[in-house]
């Protein structure tokens, strides 16, 4: 998260917690026409999977946070507030969240290049809270990344395990019709009748 997003997350987290929910993280996206402030919320880990986040939860958080933002005013200018569930491709914002999803695949964008790359995709192998690092397995190679160097990260869902992978066609591929080769290239094209 950016410094601005971190400050806003620290400001809003107690409000979200008071509603019995968890603030996973905040995205602050400035733009010339107005910024977007996106909050990702979820039910506390202890209540999962019995309870899931729903539209009513998002609406409650939106109302409360909106009122708080009007009073605190941490964003100058116009902005749009979005409150969302994390979804299956959930974003990851901190070491604790990476640790929760150890063994899963993630897509990561780095702030600064590491080994000549800013993007990597691999399995979350381990986290080291003391060192502030996350170890990924990328193309069968161990890659250690500082949590401070992560700009964005998202879980890469296992669509097959979720039962949502597209099925592969079986059998031979359908044959395409052959182009008509009976006409001679010297014959003039048929003329369309003109309306008069």
UniProtKB/Swiss-Prot annotation:
It is found in: Cytoplasm. Keywords: Cytoplasm, Ribosome biogenesis. One of its GO terms (biological process) is ribosomal small subunit assembly. The keyword Cytoplasm applies. InterPro entries: Ribosome_maturation_RimP, RimP_C, RimP_C_sf, RimP_N, RimP_N_sf. Its main location: cytoplasm. The keyword Cytoplasm applies. Residues 163-196 are annotated as: Disordered. Pfam families: DUF150_C (PF17384), RimP_N (PF02576). One of its GO terms (cellular component) is cytosol. Belongs to the RimP family. Required for maturation of 30S ribosomal subunits. This is Ribosome maturation factor RimP. The lineage of its organism: Bacteria, Pseudomonadati, Pseudomonadota, Gammaproteobacteria, Lysobacterales.
């Amino acid at each position: 998260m950016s410094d601005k997003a971190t400050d806003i997350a620290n400001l809003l987290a107690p409000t979200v917690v008071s509603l019995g929910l968890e603030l996973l993280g905040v995205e602050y996206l400035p733009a010339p026409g107005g910024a977007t402030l996106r909050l990702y919320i979820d039910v506390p880990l202890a209540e999962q999977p019995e309870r899931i986040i729903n539209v009513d939860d998002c609406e409650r958080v939106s109302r409360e946070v909106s009122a708080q933002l009007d009073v605190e005013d941490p964003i100058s200018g116009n902005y749009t507030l979005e409150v969302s569930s994390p979804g299956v491709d959930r974003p990851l914002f901190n070491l604790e969240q990476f640790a929760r999803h150890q063994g899963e695949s993630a897509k990561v964008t780095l702030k600064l290049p590491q080994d000549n790359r800013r993007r990597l995709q691999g399995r979350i192998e381990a986290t080291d809270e003391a060192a502030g690092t996350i170890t990924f397995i990328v193309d069968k190679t161990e890659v250690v990344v500082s949590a401070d160097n992560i700009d964005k990260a998202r879980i890469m869902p296992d669509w097959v395990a979720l039962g949502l992978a597209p099925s592969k066609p079986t059998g031979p591929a359908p044959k395409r019709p052959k182009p008509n080769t009976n006409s001679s290239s010297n014959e003039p094209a048929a003329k369309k009748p003109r309306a008069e």
